[in-house]
Structure formats: C-alpha cells, structure tokens
Amino acid sequence: MAHSRARRRKRASATQLYQTCKAAGTCPSDIIPKVEHNTIADQILKWGSLGVFFGGLGIGTGSGTGGRTGYIPLQSTPRPDIPSVPTARPPILVDTVAPGDPSIVSLVEESAIINSGAPELVPPSHAGFEITTSESTTPAILDVSVTTHTTSTSVFKNPSFADPSVVQSQPAVEAGGHILISTSSISSHPVEEIPLDTFIVSSSDSNPASSTPIPASGARPRIGLYSKALHQVQVTDPAFLSSPQRLITFDNPAYEGEDVTLHFAHNTIHEPPDDAFMDIIRLHRPAIQSRRGRVRFSRIGQRGSMYTRSGKHIGGRIHFYQDISPISAAAEEIELHPLVATAQDSGLFDIYAEPDPDVTEEPVSLSFSTSTPFQRSSVSATPWGNTTVPLSLPADMFVQPGPDIIFPTASTTTPYSPVTPALPTGPVFISGAAFYLYPTWYFARKRRKRVSLFFADVAA
C-alpha cells in the first residue's frame, strides 16, 4: 500500500509572524529587518542618498512627494468666477423753477443764517480824511538838474616795461577755391632773432641726420640650447655646416637648403654615415651664437627611437654644435710689406758694371760626393771678360747620392796639348744604381751616336 505524502502547509507572511513573535522575542532573523525596512539594500539606499544628488527626482526610500516641484494633477477643475454686478447710482433730484420765480437763485438760503446774538457792525459814514480827485490835461514836468563829475588820470611811461605788440590778422579771402590769409608784419617794437641750437649730446663729430628717437630694443629671447632636456653632441665633420643631410641619409638632389627644417623618414632599420645621427627624424634650422669667445653653429635634432601604433614618434632631443672660429678680443695689427721691390732686392743686373770691390771673391768648390752638404758661402763674382754673374748658394743643402760622372782629360806629358772645349764632348761613364732618367728618354728612339775624337800630330 503506497503511503501518501503529507501536504505542505503554507507559511504565514512576514507581517503575521512579526505581530506574534515581536513581543515574545522569537522572530526569525529575516523577519524584523524586512518589516522594519532595515535590510542591506535599505541601508545602501539610506547612506548612498547622503552623497548622491538625483536632481530633485524624488528617488529614495521616503514617501513619494514628487520632488521639489511636486506632482501636477492631470485634470484640474478651475474654480468658478463670481461675476461683478455694477451698483446703481441714486438719482439726483432737481428742483423745478416756476414762471413767477426770480431768475437769480440765491446759493445760500436766508433761513440758513443763524444770528448768534452779537451786535451788528455798521461801517461809519465819514472816514478820517477825504480823497479829492481832479482831472487836468497839463503834463507834469519835473525839474531835474544834471550834475557833472570830472575824473583825471595821470600816465607815467616805464622804460623797463614794453607793451606786447598786437597784430591783427586780416579776414580770410577766398579766391578761385583757395583761402588766402594775410598777416600784418608791421610792429612798433624791435624784433630779437634768437638762433636755434641743438641739445643733443653726441660723442661723434657727425650730427644725427634726423631727430627721430631710436626705439629701445627689447631683450632678445634666449635660446635654451643648454638645458638638461637636451643632450649635447659636438660634431667635427665640416659637412655639418653646408649639407647636414649627408650625415643622416644619402645625398638628395632635391634638397631645398640648409636654412629650413629637415625631415627624414626611416621605414627600415638603417645605419647613418655618422653614428651620432642615429634615429634622427627631424633636424631644425640652424642658429649661430657666441659661446665662450667662439662662434658656434647649432642645430636641434629630434630622435625617433620609439613610435606608437598611431604613428607618433617618441625620442629625446639632441643639440648638435660645431665651433667655427674664435672671436678675437682686439684687432690684430699686421705689418704690411711694400709691393714694389727695392733696388737692393731687384733681380736685374748690369752685366757691364764693374765688380764690387767690397765683395770678396772666393772660389766655389763643387763636390758631388755622397751625402755631402754645401756650406754657406758669401756671394762671389767670377770675372769672364766684362760680364759679371753673381752666384749665391743657399745654406746647408744636402746632396742625394747619385751617379759619378768621369770626364776624359788629355795627357800632360807632352809640351803641347789639344784645346779642350768648354763643354764635355767625350764619352760619359755612369757608375751607380740610384739615378733616374729624364721622362722623355723613356720613349725616345735609340740612335747611334758618333763621338768625334780630337787628334793632334805629335812632333818627334
């Protein structure tokens, strides 16, 4: 036999449980906060409303009042207006005038005058004086005597005081569209001419050409090239002055000039010609300034070490500079030499002139030995008839080793010897290894040389 399951009975509501268990203190833990609106959600709304303003929307745990403005009813019944009824003015009664009544109606009725019993004042018939009036056609003439008063003034002329001359200008006359104004120049007092003088103190002898004041030049803005944000790099390559793009990329024939800002786009990793210009994407225009007594050529470069997805480059700033030349404190005095040579230094010689007796004649010995220096000698003159040729040798000239040249000489055993010509015509014997031929002899055509020998008969 199957057992039937017991029917589940519905639990009482929270309000019913709160009414029975509140006094006994046996209420479950969730009944009292729910009925008294003290749950976690109610506390969040209570404390959150203190710091959050909802603009008067009435959002909260309180009663719905519609905010500050309140609720507006959908349908409003206006109160009926009470109509105003004008009040009637009472009629004015007008008395009628009978035909027999007088035409002048007294405004004050006699019956309205009340006599208080005081005595009535009656004006007297005769006053204290009489006024007599008469009419006459004769005009009244008054006898008025004229009194004359004489005033005398004395004028003394002061020679130390001179009255200013008053010049009256003539009225303007218009003739042919032009206004002509003439002024009289006649004066009764002498005119003193005062020459104008300048009050400008000038250190130079020349006076200024104009009186316009020189505007004060303001302080020039200082270029911040030596701050901590810039890395200082000195460039020694001379190409930095004329064509700095050669230090970063290859030479561009469409280059505009060095006075503009240079931009460089590097799509791939590359190595510049100069390692100091690595990752340079922008090179600003040059600036020339003085730094510690030297002229300095400067440019500011921008590195593109990193770049974001949006394409913006991020990198430091570098100050590239190169010192051109020093600035001298004072002008240097350079001695000028004459351009025209004097008579002593002239290279023209008179071949017919007599030799100078003061000049000592010393024979010059020429030695062609290896590594033999020439000694300094005085100027010597070798007489050949009437011709005098001065010979001047430099000081301490070393002769490089070369070939030894031997000239043939005639025998002196006989009393008679043939005449030897001035130039050697015999064969030349060259002994040595360190010598160089003249360049034209390398490609010269070899020809057979005939050496003419001089013979003489010898008497027995």
UniProtKB/Swiss-Prot annotation:
Subunit organization: Interacts with major capsid protein L1. Interacts with E2; this interaction inhibits E2 transcriptional activity but not the DNA replication function E2. Interacts with host GADD45GIP1. Interacts with host HSPA8; this interaction is required for L2 nuclear translocation. Interacts with host importins KPNB2 and KPNB3. Forms a complex with importin alpha2-beta1 heterodimers via interaction with the importin alpha2 adapter. Interacts with host DYNLT1; this interaction is essential for virus intracellular transport during entry.
Family: Belongs to the papillomaviridae L2 protein family.
Localization: Virion; Host nucleus; Host early endosome; Host Golgi apparatus
Main location: virion
PTM notes: Highly phosphorylated.
Pfam families hit by this protein: Late_protein_L2
Keyword DNA-binding: yes
Protein name, UniProt field: Minor capsid protein L2
Keywords, alphabetical: Capsid protein, Cytoplasmic inwards viral transport, Disulfide bond, DNA-binding, Host endosome, Host Golgi apparatus, Host nucleus, Host-virus interaction, Late protein, Microtubular inwards viral transport, Phosphoprotein, Viral penetration into host nucleus, Virion, Virus entry into host cell
Keyword Transmembrane among record annotations: no
GO molecular function, one term: DNA binding
HAMAP family according to UniProt: PPV_L2
Domain of life: Viruses
Disulfide bonds: C21-C27
The species this protein was found in: Human papillomavirus 44
Residue positions of motif Nuclear localization signal: 1-12, 443-451
